[in-house]
Structures are given as C-alpha cells and as structure tokens.
Amino acid sequence: MGEIKLIVGLANPGAEYAQTRHNAGAWYVEELARICGVSLVPDSKYFGLTARAVLHGKDVRLLIPTTYMNLSGKAVGALANFFRITPEEILVAHDELDMPPGVAKFKLGGGHGGHNGLKDIIAKLANDKNFYRLRIGIGHPGDKNKVSGYVLGKAPAKEQELINAAVDEAVRSTEVLFKEDMVKAMTRLHSFKAE
C-alpha cells in the first residue's frame, strides 16, 4: 500500500449534530488531532476543518468536512485534488451500523453500504472505491425505517462509552499504522472489543 496522506472524519456540521452517532468519524479525527498537538481550523478552500499533522515522522492531512454528510465528497475531492492524493492514500472514518458499539475495523475498498457520506466520496473520486475506511461500530436499531433517526440521535451513556473506547483504540492503531504498517494496525484493532 501507499502511505496514508489524508485522514477524513465524516460528520454533519453544527452543535446540534456534534454528539450524534453519525459523527463518530469526526470524533476519531478530533482525537487524532489532539494527540498530534494540532488544531483543526476552518478552510473554505476544502469545505471543512483541516490540519497538517505529523505521525511518526510522516506528514498527513486531517479533514472533517463541514458540508452536510451527503456532500462529503466535495471536501475530500477538493483536498485530494489540490495535494495530488490518490484514493489509496486516503483513510475515511465513518459510523458503521453493521458493527456493534465498542468495535472498529480498517477496510480497503468496497461499496458504500447505504452510507451517504461514502456514497458521495466514491462519486467525487470518479467512482474509485479503492480508499481505506475506518468503520466505527454504532450498532443497528433493528428496523431499517428507524436508521435515519438512529444515526442522527445520541447514543445512551453506556453505548457512548463503548464507542469512545473503540475510537481511542483506533487512534492507537493508527499510530501503529504510521510506525509499522496496515497489517499490524489491522491485527491490533481487529482483536479489540470494548465491553
């Protein structure tokens, strides 16, 4: 694999969405920025909050789009084009309905699984699905008609603790990714489950 040069955390903008399950990807990028000692600042050129960080001597751009979720590709495309970053050098963190809270996994490629943020990113990357994802489990409401309200709702305290623990472990695994490689990062993260 090429090195990861752009890490994106998917979210909806604004205080009313900040603590909703759909913003789990942003929580991960915020924590990554914190441990790297950098601040995410608004940049209208890239339609989001951005920072330049260094992880184990390697440069990486951090991005949280401030478009709405279904327009995330606008931000990702703008930054990737400007810095000539290819899809396989991008890691997109997002909430994942098909995994329980307390679990997170890396993945290369695949479809969008109905996730509007991923759907728009794939479209804006000329239908190239070959980017990395960090899937952060939020669980499923059990009824597909309840999904929208579920992802835009806040998790109960115990579930939130589990999601936060998985996000923290994902950040530590990202350090392994930059220090070692994706295989070691996957091995570490995929054996983790918060209880």
Curated annotation (Swiss-Prot):
This is Peptidyl-tRNA hydrolase. It catalyses: an N-acyl-L-alpha-aminoacyl-tRNA + H2O = an N-acyl-L-amino acid + a tRNA + H(+). The keyword Nucleotidyltransferase does not apply. It is an enzyme of class 3 (hydrolase). GO terms for molecular function: peptidyl-tRNA hydrolase activity; tRNA binding. TRNA binds at Y17, Y68, N70, N116. Pfam families: Pept_tRNA_hydro (PF01195). The record marks N12 as: Discriminates between blocked and unblocked aminoacyl-tRNA. It is found in: Cytoplasm. GO terms for biological process: protein quality control for misfolded or incompletely synthesized proteins; rescue of stalled ribosome. The lineage of its organism: Bacteria, Pseudomonadati, Pseudomonadota, Gammaproteobacteria, Alteromonadales. The active site is at H22. The keyword tRNA processing does not apply. Its EC number is 3.1.1.29. Hydrolyzes ribosome-free peptidyl-tRNAs (with 1 or more amino acids incorporated), which drop off the ribosome during protein synthesis, or as a result of ribosome stalling. Catalyzes the release of premature peptidyl moieties from peptidyl-tRNA molecules trapped in stalled 50S ribosomal subunits, and thus maintains levels of free tRNAs and 50S ribosomes. Keywords: Cytoplasm, Hydrolase, RNA-binding, tRNA-binding. Signal peptide: none annotated. Its main location: cytoplasm. The record marks D95 as: Stabilizes the basic form of H active site to accept a proton. Monomer. GO terms for cellular component: cytoplasm. Belongs to the PTH family.
